[in-house]
């Protein structure tokens, strides 16, 4: 029997909560530039499922991979690390 690997988890900031049960989470990472050898910030945005509509813009959240929930949603909000002020 085939076993599934670990699901990826990212920590990011909620940048949009205008949709019902969906938030957009911006995840920032550092990438080393090939030519200049300097670390550059890269931002990726993920649509994540928020079942209780508990997230607000500015919240720090942890998201994890899941099965496809819609055309763009493949992530779920696991928990809110820090609420926005």
From Swiss-Prot:
It holds the Pfam family Ribosomal_S17. One of the primary rRNA binding proteins, it binds specifically to the 5'-end of 16S ribosomal RNA. InterPro entries: NA-bd_OB-fold, Ribosomal_uS17, Ribosomal_uS17_bact/chlr, Ribosomal_uS17_CS. One of its GO terms (molecular function) is structural constituent of ribosome. CDD domains: Ribosomal_uS17. The keyword Ribosomal protein applies. PANTHER family: 40S RIBOSOMAL PROTEIN S11 FAMILY MEMBER (PTHR10744), SMALL RIBOSOMAL SUBUNIT PROTEIN US17M (PTHR10744:SF1). This is Small ribosomal subunit protein uS17. GO terms for biological process: translation. Coiled coil: none annotated. Keywords: Ribonucleoprotein, Ribosomal protein, RNA-binding, rRNA-binding. The gene is rpsQ. Belongs to the universal ribosomal protein uS17 family. It comes from Desulfosudis oleivorans (strain DSM 6200 / JCM 39069 / Hxd3) (Desulfococcus oleovorans). The keyword Mitochondrion does not apply. Part of the 30S ribosomal subunit. One of its GO terms (cellular component) is cytosolic small ribosomal subunit.
